[in-house]
């Protein structure tokens, strides 16, 4: 019953966002929903059956569902220089920005990719490339340490929850944060197709920041409720 409810609440936004069309965001929502169902204790045979169905659907989706620009994004993941001025442009400029940052970055100099506007969407989807060019490897390392500390705290709070429903809810929020964080970093680094996923708590955008603040507030509320019950 729980799996059915989770799947229902996953498929509704998946279909609506897919119709927009926004294939990347819809697939991420579906992926997060499937992870939650798996963590809720879905039968292993059902999991294997679902994986087989998804794998079998890939050829059909490639030839009959995906549009040309969506296919080009996937192909450019392997060879962005095949179309350097169109679909591969973002990946190339982002990789150059990350690589040119070096160890300490160019914050005291002039960032070629960001300041000269070669890199698009510098304040939203590709903000990590801007950080890499301006503050280099050391700046990225500090950024990852801060993100790791935040994530560690979220996971600790989640594991401390006793009620299964509360823990499942908190796990959902943590997975949303992890998936969006990793996909954005992989996308900017050229390890994932370009999708419109902002970097949590870093990319410019009121709605994105507002949602993550709500998520952290709900996790904190679950933690406080557990503490009150214990006392």
Locate each region found by the language model.
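Transmembrane helix boundary and interhelical junction motifs in multipass membrane proteins
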Residues: 22-27, 106-111, 122-124, 141, ...
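Hydrophobic alpha-helical transmembrane segments of multi-pass inner membrane proteins, especially
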Residues: 1-90, 129-189, 214, 218
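A juxtamembrane structural motif centered on a specific transmembrane helix
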Residues: 182-231
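Long extracytoplasmic/lumenal interhelical loops at the membrane interface
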Residues: 98, 102-138, 165
């Amino acid at each position: 019953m729980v799996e059915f409810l989770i799947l229902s609440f996953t498929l509704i936004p998946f279909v609506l966002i897919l119709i927009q069309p926004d294939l990347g965001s819809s697939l991420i929502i579906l992926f997060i929903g499937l992870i939650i169902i798996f963590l809720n204790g879905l039968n292993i045979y059902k999991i294997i059956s679902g994986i087989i169905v998804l794998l079998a659907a890939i050829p059909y989706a490639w030839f009959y569902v995906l549009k040309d620009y969506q296919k080009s994004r996937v192909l450019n993941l392997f060879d962005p220089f095949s179309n350097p001025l169109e679909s591969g442009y973002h990946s190339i400029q982002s990789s150059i920005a990350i690589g040119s940052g070096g160890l300490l970055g160019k914050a005291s100099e002039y960032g070629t990719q960001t300041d000269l506007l070669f890199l698009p969407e510098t304040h939203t989807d590709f903000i990590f490339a801007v950080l890499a060019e301006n503050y280099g490897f050391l700046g990225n390392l500090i950024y990852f340490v801060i993100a790791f500390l935040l994530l560690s705290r979220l996971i600790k709070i989640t594991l401390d929850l006793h009620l299964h429903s509360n823990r499942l809810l908190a796990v959902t929020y943590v997975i949303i944060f992890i998936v969006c964080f990793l996909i954005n970093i992989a996308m900017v680094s050229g390890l994932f197709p370009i999708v419109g996923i902002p970097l949590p708590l870093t990319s410019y955008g009121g709605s994105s920041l507002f949602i993550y603040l709500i998520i952290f507030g709900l996790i904190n509320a679950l933690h406080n409720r557990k503490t009150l019950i214990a006392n």
